[in-house]
Curated annotation (Swiss-Prot):
This is Elongation factor 1-delta 1. Residues 80-109 are annotated as: Disordered. Keywords: Elongation factor, Protein biosynthesis. The keyword Protein biosynthesis applies. PROSITE patterns: EF1BD_1, EF1BD_2. The keyword Protein biosynthesis applies. SUPFAM superfamilies: eEF-1beta-like, GST C-terminal domain-like. The lineage of its organism: Eukaryota, Viridiplantae, Streptophyta, Embryophyta, Tracheophyta. EF-1-beta and EF-1-beta' stimulate the exchange of GDP bound to EF-1-alpha to GTP. Belongs to the EF-1-beta/EF-1-delta family. It comes from Oryza sativa subsp. japonica (Rice).
């Protein structure tokens, strides 16, 4: 089923896309697809960070494209006032054909009038946000940390053990590697996935890395990358 967006170069188009992405990680489905690529390609520059959801989505798709590209087909998407092709976009001849009325059933305006169910769901989300005091619904984030030792004599195996020994709900440690810094010193780069509502990265660093016993090995820790997933 094709979906339509207004011009993402305009303030109105960005605002509506930002509202659409409030409860979604991708344009369609549960993984990056050609639909995301089509909308991504409609941007001449990165969107303003004031459009929180669009900026989060754009950064994530940009990172995926740099890593491995997008492989899923998607459902088809049209972005008005752009020249982005879509596999599900009807030909000009088809648009003028008598059967155009039937095509309209498959051309869904995502920003059209809401149904009663959609209005009710939006009200419930707004109530939940107000009750929790948060600006948006919880999600997950992928975080890359640089963990630095005191000197070249620090046992890096013990340092990594101290890091991975930090366990809490909503925290999952991932891949790691040692990266040379200079003068025989190496730092630990380690990935982690967190549930945003359950884990504060700043608090984790302050409360666990900079206190005993971890601070025997850890001199400092920096957040290198922080991306929504």
């Amino acid at each position: 089923m094709a979906v339509s967006f207004t011009n993402v170069s305009s303030e109105a188009g960005l605002k509506k896309l930002d509202e659409y992405l409030l409860t979604r990680s991708y344009i369609s489905g549960y993984q990056a697809s050609n639909d995301d690529l089509a909308v991504y390609s409609a941007f001449s520059t990165a969107p303003s960070s004031s459009y929180t959801n669009v900026a989060r989505w754009f950064t994530h798709i940009d990172a995926l494209l740099r890593l491995s590209g997008v492989t899923a087909d998607g459902q088809g998407v049209k972005v008005e006032s752009t020249a982005v092709p879509s596999a599900s976009t009807p030909d000009v001849a088809d648009a003028k054909a008598p059967a155009a009325d039937d095509d309209d059933d498959d051309d869904v305006d995502l920003f059209g009038e809401e149904t009663e169910e959609e209005k009710k769901a939006a009200e419930e989300r707004a109530a939940a946000v107000k009750a929790s005091g948060k600006k948006k619904e919880s999600g997950k984030s992928s975080v890359l940390l640089d963990v630095k030792p005191w000197d070249d004599e620090t046992d890096m195996t013990k340092l990594e053990e101290a890091v991975r020994n930090v366990k809490m709900e909503g925290l999952l440690w991932g891949a790691s590697k040692l990266v040379p810094v200079g003068y025989g010193i190496k730092k630990l780069q380690i990935m982690m996935t967190i549930v945003d509502d359950l884990v504060s990265v700043d608090s984790l660093i302050e409360d666990y890395f900079y206190t005993e016993p971890a601070n025997e090995y850890i001199q400092s820790c920096d957040i290198v990358a922080f991306n929504k997933i």
